[in-house]
Curated annotation (Swiss-Prot):
InterPro entries: ARM-like, ARM-type_fold, Mo25. This is Mo25-like protein. Coiled coil: none annotated. The gene is pmo25. One of its GO terms (molecular function) is protein serine/threonine kinase activator activity. GO terms for biological process: intracellular signal transduction; protein localization to medial cortex; RAM/MOR signaling; regulation of establishment or maintenance of bipolar cell polarity regulating cell shape; regulation of microtubule cytoskeleton organization. GO terms for cellular component: cell division site; cell tip; cytoplasm; cytosol; mitotic spindle pole body; new mitotic spindle pole body; non-growing cell tip; nucleus. Belongs to the Mo25 family.
Length: 329
């Protein structure tokens, strides 16, 4: 990293200009090596300037000047555009640079959020990178950082690209599918009121696609989706969503099937959704009918359900409550 301490260090303007000049050259065969070196050096410079080091905090005035140059030059878009062309360490630096920029605020303003709102074309590109392992994880880290901000999360939720996560989660690559699920979860849990409104408006389509995840043959997909469903339904902001979901006979039937899944972990997660149907004081007639029809089987099954969890007081209390409610039907 001697370039950071040479006799004539690049100014912030020089660093940004160097990146803007060299990033497009990564697609050109002639003299690629020199462009890779320049981009690598400048990204390291940028990362150290914005993030500091273990020993030195970033200089506030330098960060302010550098950020201004970054926005003025449209560098964030260029970094996303040419992300697949970057070398491994440069991709890591890019992720850290975006994280630092997105967390930077001036009073109550987040300048990078404003920039991203003005350039929404960045989001489809980032989501599309989940198709390519070499950039998926950097793109995912940037998307999750964006989802921390309500205004950017709204853009993600209301774009067509949000719906592609339902297929990305089922990718054949475990690592890529897990990362996509982490982003999906961040989008759905970070801003509860906003997400409640979104799910309410898109209720039928959302749960049509979500049910596919719950029926997945992939153990990890099924378990993660089931656990997330419980978190979504138990959010206070999602009360109307929960009420509508637990009024459905089809949803109840699915949970009863999952209660008997061969995996004990999936059984356990299914119980935490199933209990909502039973505890609902205003059950729909179709839900009551199914519970009554299966009353004796449910009581017998739940009486022996996960009895090895002797030290889990909350679970045992809830299981006893559910059994008692079914007995009263």
């Amino acid at each position: 990293m001697s370039f950071l301490f040479n006799k004539r260090p690049k100014s912030t303007q020089d660093v940004v200009r160097c990146l803007c000049d060299n990033l497009p050259k990564l697609e050109i065969n002639n003299d690629k090596k020199k462009s890779f070196e320049e981009v690598s050096k400048c990204l390291q410079n940028l990362r150290v300037s914005l993030c500091g080091t273990a020993e030195v905090e970033p200089d506030a005035d330098l960060v302010s000047d550098l950020s201004f140059q970054i926005y003025q030059s449209n560098l964030p878009f260029l970094l996303v555009r040419y992300l697949p062309k970057l070398e491994f360490e440069s991709k890591k630096d890019t992720g850290l640079i975006f994280s630092a920029l997105l967390r930077r605020h001036v009073a109550s303003r987040y300048p990078t959020v404003d920039y991203m709102l003005a350039h929404p074309q960045i989001f489809p590109v980032l989501v599309s990178y989940y198709r390519y392992q070499e950039v998926a994880f950097t793109a995912g880290s940037i998307l999750r950082e964006c989802s921390r901000h309500e205004a950017l999360n709204e853009v993600l939720l209301n774009s067509r690209d949000f719906w592609t996560f339902f297929s990305l989660i089922q990718a054949s690559s475990f690592d890529m599918a897990s990362d996509a699920f982490s982003t999906f979860k961040s989008i759905l849990l970070n801003h509860k009121s906003q997400v409640a409104e979104f799910i309410s408006y898109h209720f039928d389509e959302f749960f049509k696609q979500y049910t596919v995840l719950l029926k997945s043959e992939n153990y990890v997909t099924k378990r993660q989706s089931l656990k997330l469903l419980g978190e979504i339904l138990l959010n206070r902001a999602n009360r109307s969503v929960m009420t509508r979901y637990i009024s459905s006979a089809e949803n109840l039937k699915l949970m009863m099937i999952l209660l008997r899944d061969k995996s004990k972990n999936i059984q356990f997660e299914a119980f935490h959704v199933f209990k909502l149907f039973v505890a609902n004081p205003e059950k729909s007639e179709e839900v009551i009918e199914i519970l009554r029809r299966n009353k004796s089987k449910l009581i017998s099954y739940l009486s022996a359900f996960h009895t090895d969890r002797k030290n889990d007081e909350q679970f045992n209390d809830e299981r006893a409550f559910v059994i008692k409610q079914i007995e009263r039907l």
